[in-house]
């Protein structure tokens, strides 16, 4: 964009000169000089018709003498060329600053600096906002980073090259005025201006003050700059040098001011109260009597949304005005409702936001008075409008209003956190908002807004707010179920608040009420009643009360003793209510005879609770009480669970071992009960089982762990209602059907794959049908006979005919296209989807029990069995998108297992660990790493790759655990490791991979890195090991250089053996052919050895040099062999 602000005149020049200059400027042609060829905003060249005398006079001035092309550093043109048309980067600006600051030639530096500033200052007057901002950022950086620049010279350049007429006429003067303001603002931020020299202050503020009478956007920009600059000046300097310059435009009645000039006046008052006190400003605005509505009208009029600072200064003025001014503001806002202009709405909301952030503690009640019902309605309506307005093509004013509403919400939260001191005022303001909109978060964009306000309340206020929501449950209209549920959710939030954890008595009272509301029908007086007399709240929200009660009962429970104590109090209260007349008829789910019979045992348990020292007794007590409580709910568990727990408790607490039933131990029944409880819906069951199981795990046996592991057997469905025999027979039938389906088309797998992809044509499909019919017609003994495809029906008896008929029917049915109904039948039904979801959640919860086992009993058998099971679960879920939650849970537990050490007993054999390693490594498929490098990988790459990665990590973990106590080479796992390594080296296809040994190197706990490196180096044999395996070994050793260096420092003997093997390998390479890749990897390893391997490194370098000519010769021979032979045509000769 071309800039049209190149003026040969300055302020104060005669009018005739200005007129002539403008005419010349209009006639001037845009020609580029060598120096000005790369400016961001192109500068017009001087008119050729300018008088020679004027030219000579201007060339003799000092400022223009510095801009001669011959004196300018030519490197600056390169920098400007890079800047043009590219985004501003730190590297660009640093290159320009370095050029201006580090030039040792003073004359050249001065000329270059002047030229740079001239170009950039002219660019600030461009008719393009992006160009102006870019040039201003460069000027700001240069003035702050180059100390040799004089601010007065910048001002002179500004007045000369970006002059503005005394009367701003036309677009050129307006653009030049913007450039002057921007450049002046850059000077205000320089270290030189920070010294506050009177001469510089006067010069800069003369430029700023001159724009207070310009166009509206210039006055707005100038006002913002002035308000910021006041904070940099001492009061004395401002009063003597700046205030006289501003008074002509500011010292006027309110009727003579605009919003921006009034804003500058408020900024002077707020910054320099000693210069312009409150009485002085009031007298200036209203010579007779203050009329605050005139001030408010000034800010509300117009359609422009001003900058945030304008509203912040008005808010500070209101706060300082005390009760009268805030009351006048509140009345004015209410009287203007409803506001129609977005600018007026923005003003009201922005000012209120800043009032909330700046009021004084003694004015809390005044702030509360501002939030009248009318004001609250206006604020929440605007917040709701911007939240639910999802339109993309919005007006700029709507976008600004949306940001302002966001700021208001944040200001209110900050006010609660930092400003409000009186807790009653916090609660009062929150209740005002809730009275208008009960579901406050539905109209507020800030996430968890209501929760943030509630978190700032004290314990007493939380109790009051809880009562407010509780009373709302009965005062709402009968049909308003949504609001009642919301109130219950808020009550749950308050009930589980961390501040109320110490108020046990109040919390127990609320839990008792929720228990009553969840299990009984309640009337309008909150008393148990018959179903016919139940209130609307009881009919609509009893189920939700039940959920909240059970969830809150276990919230942040301190442990098993605390849980038992809480259940004792709760069950005692429930038992008391059940003892009332006709209590059974008032229950939402009346108890059956079996539960009433078992309830007598519960009453006995309440009379004689277990001691805290008796962990098993308390565990059973918690289980029995909680299950009996859950049996009274609408969705109870099976009554057999309670009966089994009562019998188990009796057996577990028997002192005589002879009376214990050896066939079925109480631990087995208890484990089954825990698993059955995990099947129940409701997150509280998972939390409850974890609480109880944490205390019981040390008392369980390995057989109980196997019960949990059986749930995670991915080949069986633990929720299946069929018996094992039925499942096996079903599996056999499925296998037979699959074999039967695949027998007809197994001859041509490629055609089948094409058919699956929808690429088979009708002809191939017909051939398949024909072959299927032929197979159906042949006799058992004629399968290989070529003539068996024909049948003589005269020789066919009735039995054989029925067989052929059935075979033909199966053949045609097999290839019959499936209808839409048949395809829909193949999709899982709703019940099947629910069952699969329940099974998924059940298995995830079962993983919690496994985590408790490895935490409480990290024995060898426990860790190995859990590790194998969890890895199998992960492997099964890795590629199944429907099991991703189970995959993540199993992977999370797998990481925890690998972080724990196995606790071995004294002289305990590590043979099970070796078996686990062999079982783990045999689980993978044989694969070729050479095929993988050549791109011949299977289709499901990522899932298999992830499985192999975690298998290798498990392998490294087991190896380190098997050799944790002694020297690795003397451990039982070392021979197995060497055997694995030999198999990997010898075989092309192997279950092991390079990553398996890499995982061993990366295992921080294992001490066998040094001897393993020696074994790997021993396989660097040109005669015995393939080149691909040698390259893999070299790659591994080169990548683990630092780890090897540390390992060899602690093991000197292994270090010497390793050097010996490497030296042997180097000697082999001198006589045997090798690849360049091999040599490069070997050089990398030798480079890590320093001076001691210098000789070996030189040997390899010679081998590498000899290899280059041989490669060229081989390449030439290969190219020659590939050339086609020219055979002469004998006939032509």
Curated annotation (Swiss-Prot):
Domain of life: Eukaryota
Disruption phenotype: Reduced rRNA transcription which results in larval reduced growth. RNAi-mediated knockdown in the fat body results in the mislocalization of nclb from the nucleolus to the nucleoplasm.
Listed Basic and acidic residues bias regions: 20-35, 50-60
GO cellular component terms, semicolon-separated: cytoplasm; nucleolus
Keywords for this protein: Cytoplasm, Nucleus, Ribosome biogenesis
Compositional bias per record (Acidic residues), positions renumbered to this chain: 725-735, 744-762
Known partners and oligomeric status: Interacts with nclb.
Function: Has a role in rRNA biogenesis, cell proliferation and tissue growth by contributing to the localization of nclb to the nucleolus.
The protein, known as: Myb-binding protein 1A
Originating organism: Drosophila melanogaster (Fruit fly)
Gene name of this polypeptide: Mybbp1A
